[in-house]
Amino acid sequence: MILVDTSAWIEWLIGSPTGDALVDQLPEQAYWLVPTMVQLELAKWLTREIGEDKADQVIAFTQVCQVVPLDTEIALAAAEACRAHRLATADAIIFATAQARRATLLTCDRHFEGLPGVTLVEKRPA
């Protein structure tokens, strides 16, 4: 299972050089984990930057993946991740979700660098 972080989603969606580098690491859609926090961040970014229609299309795509809602177990693990790794709340929820589901976290966000179960794809120049 792969949890694709919002940063990786955005790079992939805009077709950046970094997004192109991610393509080989993306599994079939059924093996993507999508926390509801990632859905929130994607909807917010897409609506602001691209438009509501594209946001609706991407959220529909995520719903074919394995959507993981925030529950008490993940919330408590996220609180610990905030403390232990000094992550912001949204990042901690995403990290804790990956850990709870024993998934690899695929990201372009350096906040996750060095954490267990994380594959960091460095941003490439345009």
What are these regions (language model features)?
Residues 1-34, 46-57, 126:
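Short, well-structured N-terminal submotif of metal-dependent ribonuclease cores
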Residues 7-8, 41, 73, 92-93:
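Active-site phosphate/pyrophosphate-handling residues
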Residues 9-10, 39, 75, 112-113:
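A generic structural signal for short hydrophobic patches within well-formed alpha-helices
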Residues 19, 39, 55-58, 71, ...:
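A general structural signal for well-ordered alpha-helical segments in protein cores
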Residues 41, 63-84:
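Acidic catalytic patch
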Residues 29-32, 64-66, 100-104:
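Short active-site oxyanion
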Residues 95, 99-126:
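Acidic, PIN/NYN-like endoribonuclease modules and their adjacent C-terminal/linker elements
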